[in-house]
Amino acid sequence: MRTLGTCLVTLAGLLLTAAGETFSGGCLFDEPYSTCGYSQADEDDFNWEQVNTLTKPTSDPWMPSGSFMLVNTSGKPEGQRAHLLLPQLKENDTHCIDFHYFVSSKSNAAPGLLNVYVKVNNGPLGNPIWNISGDPTRTWHRAELAISTFWPNFYQVIFEVVTSGHQGYLAIDEVKVLGHPCTRTPHFLRIQNVEVNAGQFATFQCSAIGRTVAGDRLWLQGIDVRDAPLKEIKVTSSRRFIASFNVVNTTKRDAGKYRCMICTEGGVGISNYAELVVKEPPVPIAPPQLASVGATYLWIQLNANSINGDGPIVAREVEYCTASGSWNDRQPVDSTSYKIGHLDPDTEYEISVLLTRPGEGGTGSPGPALRTRTKCADPMRGPRKLEVVEVKSRQITIRWEPFGYNVTRCHSYNLTVHYGYQVGGQEQVREEVSWDTDNSHPQHTITNLSPYTNVSVKLILMNPEGRKESQELTVQTDEDLPGAVPTESIQGSAFEEKIFLQWREPTQTYGVITLYEITYKAVSSFDPEIDLSNQSGRVSKLGNETHFLFFGLYPGTTYSFTIRASTAKGFGPPATNQFTTKISAPSMPAYEFETPLNQTDNTVTVMLKPAQSRGAPVSVYQIVVEEERPRRTKKTTEILKCYPVPIHFQNASILNSQYYFAAEFPADSLQAAQPFTIGDNKTYNGYWNTPLLPHKSYRIYYQAASRANGETKIDCVRVATKGAVTPKPVPEPEKQTDHTVKIAGVIAGILLFVIIFLGVVLVMKKRKLAKKRKETMSSTRQEMTVMVNSMDKSYAEQGTNCDEAFSFMGTHNLNGRSVSSPSSFTMKTNTLSTSVPNSYYPDETHTMASDTSSLAQPHTYKKREAADVPYQTGQLHPAIRVADLLQHITQMKCAEGYGFKEEYESFFEGQSAPWDSAKKDENRMKNRYGNIIAYDHSRVRLQMLEGDNNSDYINGNYIDGYHRPNHYIATQGPMQETIYDFWRMVWHENTASIIMVTNLVEVGRVKCCKYWPDDTEIYKDIKVTLIDTELLAEYVIRTFAVEKRGIHEIREIRQFHFTGWPDHGVPYHATGLLGFVRQVKSKSPPNAGPLVVHCSAGAGRTGCFIVIDIMLDMAEREGVVDIYNCVRELRSRRVNMVQTEEQYVFIHDAILEACLCGDTSIPASQVRSLYYDMNKLDPQTNSSQIKEEFRTLNMVTPTLRVEDCSIALLPRNHEKNRCMDILPPDRCLPFLITIDGESSNYINAALMDSYKQPSAFIVTQHPLPNTVKDFWRLVLDYHCTSVVMLNDVDPAQLCPQYWPENGVHRHGPIQVEFVSADLEEDIISRIFRIYNASRPQDGHRMVQQFQFLGWPMYRDTPVSKRSFLKLIRQVDKWQEEYNGGEGRTVVHCLNGGGRSGTFCAISIVCEMLRHQRTVDVFHAVKTLRNNKPNMVDLLDQYKFCYEVALEYLNSG
């Protein structure tokens, strides 16, 4: 409408009625408008009004005068409509409609829009042909309509008013239908219908009578289709012109009715409607059909009866081309079928049909293509010139003349090598397909043949249409060596001093076996004192003998037997197996006369002599006391000569045992003969040597036991006999009086002294006796129960002796690798001599710390009573030298008087300073716990918010660091109500590091609210955006971008979230937390604000972190630590920092581990040079740094106690353990979930962390025959996607093949299905599909097994670093591709020890290099050993980890 409005101009001045003849349809509105045949629409919002001011004057100056049709827009909302309909006109002669209109407004704003429509033949209304919407003029104007519809069409003119919401008037008057042409507007002649094919231009020619001037607008108007612009105007005379319009790129949507329009200064001219018909070129709906096919032709049916588009069809064509070619050919077709000839055999073609209708552009696009292939043709001939190139014992190589497509006449063909030979009197026929046909010198090698065999060979060229054969050749394979004797057939029956060896002849003899050669050699013995140098030899046996008895061997010795078979060509490969002779019982010394050295009523003293070992060292000596009872026969005595089952004296009566163990000694404590007293009332290795009872008779036995390889052999000898003491007769009273009087005085004096002495001793020994009673009760429980509870342990419990005083010096300083110094200290327990790191002591005046340390200064707010806190100054708790730390911790843990418990209890508990702000009612809701709140003197004060006088409070306190005031803020874990305050504090304090030492939820309780976003979050005026997350096994590092409204600054803040703290207690080991502390130190900017540290309450774990961080700095700078005074200082700043004794002890253990181990990480750029230096041998110590590092690792590796492995030691689980000395601890067991009958949920396996993922590895032993089903339950239950196998299948060592080579193996409900296998260098990879048949809804899992062949059993390390690194990378790639790195990896070797640990350690080191560009082999192995002490158990394996890291760096 706006376009039409702009094309119209005001027709000012045309106030006179045009002269000439008029037709019906006009109206002057002097009479009612209905008399003129005018009407109004029923659906209008309001009606036009007929006004006559002559008969009904008005005083409204805005209303025109006269008689007219009026719309008063006052009070009418915007958008309301009213229509005035003229009568239908059927004027075929030239005529003109003339009318006047009036527009006025009281606000100078248009009162509405006046439109004129022309509706033809009661058709759609269409768009307005004329409108006026300009500013009101308050004068009458004239307009004319030149309408050309032509007979038999009729039309109707409609006036429409659309209100604008403004007050005013719109009126029309003097509507006339004149019988002559319009004076200012051209008339169109009749326009004709147009038909085109889709995609072509449709041109409409509109001839008009009249003049056109510049400024007139012409266009082609359609109904429900697009308008077309003017193409050109051609003036044919002074009063005639032709206007052309193009509808471009026609489609079916353009078909419809169009009319010509011209807008002039005086009015509008319109033509009749013409139809645009758009025809769609025909396209077949279906592809042509294949009637028949040959090698060189295709016969098709056009199949073009059904089409898309319009007919009629005037022509047909077939277009075809090769599917891979760029050319095509088009052939006209005059029938419904067509044969395409002269085609190539076995070639794919695409064939389409094209149809044409009349008119330009009438040819449609090609129809759907038929894609088909010609048949192959019979090969021209068979292969020629077949000849033998090379003959070997197991293979022959043949060659033939090359050929190509012109011979095969087919792209799909097989060249098959057909050969036959006899095996065992039976004809064997084989076929192999050769794919080397395109080689310029084609040849094929037939392998896996038997030696000395005639083989007939021919080639067969085959395609789907036929086959051609070559001539046949016959050739004989060469002679060969025999195969190996089957390893599983080498069986040995072992005795103490002989082995009976049996074997079978090789499965593949390849001739007559003439000889067997057996080489034997002693490789190891359980007894290190045995000389094995003479225990070797070689034996030859004739080919028909397959057994031999070896005698004169040593007990307890492992012998290696290697057998080779020989034919006339020589010896075949060896087969080796090992067998171990049984150990013998120790040889006890002779005791010809059972005469004791001394004897009292309660004791017997005998001389104990060392026993002679036989095959295994003596493990232990034991003293057994047997009570002589009535009715014991000699036979029974002989049967019970030796005593394999130890029984404590306390349990002997409970068990009704006739004997008990009085003492037990380690073998090294009895190197020479020495006396021993039975009944001395002391305890030896847990056995109470109780005094003998005088009225009983005893036999004293001395026995020695040797233990090795699961065997225990005992020998014993009776060393003494004690008879019962006969009671002396009682003397007569009168003879006794003098004697009694004489001794009474002596006895009274002695008794007085004893009473005083006992009073003192009882007080001193009270706790010691209590401890002994506890140990005795514990020992009894261990004998009477199967399972014991797991207990936490520390370094002192793991490897120290509380009765010995010693000191240590670590081979690693706090900053890095080992250093050397002339001074050294000796550890008595293992004679380890190491050096003092000079960097501990930068200044001689600081070698010993005192209460001058800032950490030890008293605080103003401390309120203590002397009676409650006996130690108030640093003088009673001086700093401890790092060199003395191990001794100090050992003494504190083993102390019978003042130990960690007493030291921790000396700390002031509870409030020690005012906390009035925290106690305000307005601040109570800001505290997570009512008893852990902020002291006033050290609390963090936030900037006050407007209108809130308490908005400066947050539950957090400043804590001083090492020579850095207010270096930390200890705070609680944010609550939902305090998240905004928390970020306010972080921003205000310019904090760059947040340390979080809790999980959000622990044991079902919320410990901290999640105060950070996963993407972006706005906390009032602070915007926090997560930009990076680094997930590691025991902690997460998140990086945020933080902005504050109104401040043009973006700060980067890191959150260090330690996730490895258990729900109860403290971490089992400090290794992970120490690595976490080092990360915080390395990534915290030195000039930033305080470190914000929080757990849940902000006291216990928070205190642990801060104390450890401060003490590491102190140890590095001063060579001392002052843990006690540091904790005391922290508690003066915030209540109850370090909340439990357990945490206090853990801090000591963590600092000790840090001092022992140091920071062993190496930047990637320095690995090569440092590793070279680490391997240099020190001529003075004859050792190297890497050896010392490995020794340190062994020293700090915890030893598993019996109670740690209680589940593995249950009797029902014994048969599931390959080695009883390599057991998984209870805390890292993966309990089996899948139910399998009565089977237990135990498997000998342990969960291990990788660098980035907790419990990423499961380390286990090679499945035993009875645990294969448990192994697959483990794989399924723990979502394992990779299995790494680092040992060989060896049934002799109970290492069966546990997987299927094809088909499906069923292990209870678990089904393992073989999918595929591949061999690449030293790695066999097999893919299996496993699923639980009892739970089909769970679906299946794909598991890839990687069997590594490059680690022979006789080597401590793999043969190749490159191939082992390739194994690591293949496992990583499969893990990432199959399960996004989320699945676990099962790693197993023979016993789940050194080899498995080496794989896990190297995998961790490679992850370190990828993500941190550092190498820390020590930390990687230490982390693994925290769960299993036998991980990476050899120095060579430890070195190999470094060497693979170098290989990783070299490979890029």
From Swiss-Prot:
Residue stretches spanning the membrane: 743-764
Enzyme Commission number(s) of this protein: 3.1.3.48
GO cellular component terms, A-Z: adherens junction; lamellipodium; perinuclear region of cytoplasm; plasma membrane
InterPro entries the UniProt entry points to: ConA-like_dom_sf, FN3_dom, FN3_sf, Ig-like_dom, Ig-like_dom_sf, Ig-like_fold, Ig_sub, Immunoglobulin_dom
Membrane topology: Single-pass type I membrane protein
Residue intervals on the Extracellular side: 21-742
Disulfide bridge map: 27-36, 96-182, 206-260
Chain residues that bind substrate: 1063, 1095-1101, 1139
Main location as per UniProt: membrane
Positions on the Cytoplasmic side per record topology: 765-1452
Reactions accelerated catalytically: O-phospho-L-tyrosyl-[protein] + H2O = L-tyrosyl-[protein] + phosphate
Pfam families in UniProt: fn3 (PF00041), Fn3_PTPRU (PF23144), ig (PF00047), MAM (PF00629), Y_phosphatase (PF00102)
Record PROSITE patterns: FN3 (PS50853), IG_LIKE (PS50835), MAM_1 (PS00740), MAM_2 (PS50060), TYR_PHOSPHATASE_1 (PS00383), TYR_PHOSPHATASE_2 (PS50056), TYR_PHOSPHATASE_PTP (PS50055)
Keywords per UniProt: Cell adhesion, Cell membrane, Disulfide bond, Glycoprotein, Hydrolase, Immunoglobulin domain, Membrane, Phosphoprotein, Protein phosphatase, Receptor, Repeat, Signal, Transmembrane, Transmembrane helix
Function: Receptor protein-tyrosine phosphatase that mediates homotypic cell-cell interactions and plays a role in adipogenic differentiation via modulation of p120 catenin/CTNND1 phosphorylation. Promotes CTNND1 dephosphorylation and prevents its cytoplasmic localization where it inhibits SLC2A4 membrane trafficking. In turn, SLC2A4 is directed to the plasma membrane and performs its glucose transporter function.
Subunit structure as annotated in this protein's UniProt entry: Homodimer.
Annotated protein name in UniProt: Receptor-type tyrosine-protein phosphatase mu
Organism: Mus musculus
Lineage per the UniProt record: Eukaryota, Metazoa, Chordata, Craniata, Vertebrata
Gene this chain is encoded by: Ptprm
